[in-house]
Amino acid sequence: MSRRRLGSAVALAVLAAWSMPGLASADGRGPLQSLRMNEIQVIGTHNSYHRELSKPERAAHDAIYGGAPIYDNLLAYSHASLPNQLGRQGVRGLELDLYPDPAGGRYANPLLRRRLAAGPLTAPEWYSPGIKIIHTADLDYHSTCVRLASCLRLVRRWSRANRGHVPLLILLELKETDPVAGALGGVSVPPWDGAALDRLDAEIRSVFRRSELITPDDVRRPGLTLQRSVVRRGWPTLRRARGRVMFLMDNGPGAISAAYTAGRPSLHGRVLFTNSRPGRPDAAFVKRNEPRGANLNQIRRLVRAGYLVRTRSDEPLATVLSGDTTQRRAALSSGAQLVSTDFPEVGMSARYDRDYVVALPGGGSVRCNPVIRPRPCRSRHP
């Protein structure tokens, strides 16, 4: 075998081992540790906690919107538990929707259940103080885990059992009062003001040790804003980042992110990375959900500039029902480091007589980034 062919074979073997879910979890000191954490691509799930309403609840849900089968067309999907997504499905990104509940019990008697005379929800965690995980309060509320702290403990337990994993990216959407439910007597969601945001940071820190997190303070360089740090100096290497968890704010620029960055324009002392506008002091993470059309090149430019980007490969359930995979192809080729889907496993779309699934080319839980892949990192399936 020639030296060139031998070198290529070794590079492919290294990448294959690195990409396999089991080996990715075990490999903490492999030859690719000098890669930076933005030089890879992983699959994440959208609404990672979501479980579907019962048939009576769906009927009550759709009656609110005039009787059209809205739920079955948009929300009829369920995810495995968070540990199963991370383990069996090889997911490395999660999304959780958050509702503040400092006293406990605020969301325990949803509007739909009141209309059905079904009684309040019975799980004790609904009545405990602490942030809750809900898609839409009153209207779509079943979850694999109810309290944020409980969900995060599941993630931490998996992480500690698989210490060599690439960084887990956890997207948090901070929810507010739903206008439809609110108009019908639904719950009033407390504001995400400075105090609530401080409680969010504290709740995350109550589960994860400082050494288990990647925060803006870990990325920002002395004398530079967070944005200039990632653009000029780059992200941490995988050697530093493996086995750790990173939290990203889903909400775009607005009142909530303004409250989170108040007095901390580069997120000093904060846990979350905000979804910001490129060029702003806090801009390290950017969300671009639609990867098709002109957005494809925009995402590639952002990735090349040094930003961490999240995009989506599908919209439930239109993508599955249509059979159109252009969004999936665009998302995977965009270079966005986090590609989110509702169908990360073979068989999840079979109920719709489809075989739609989103996976990295060649399989595995992680691959070299297709847009900013460094020379030593060669994928068999670019």
Predicted regions: what they are:
Residues 27-382:
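Catalytic cores of phosphodiester-bond hydrolases, prominently lipid phosphodiesterases
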Residues 2-26, 97:
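Secretory targeting and sorting signals
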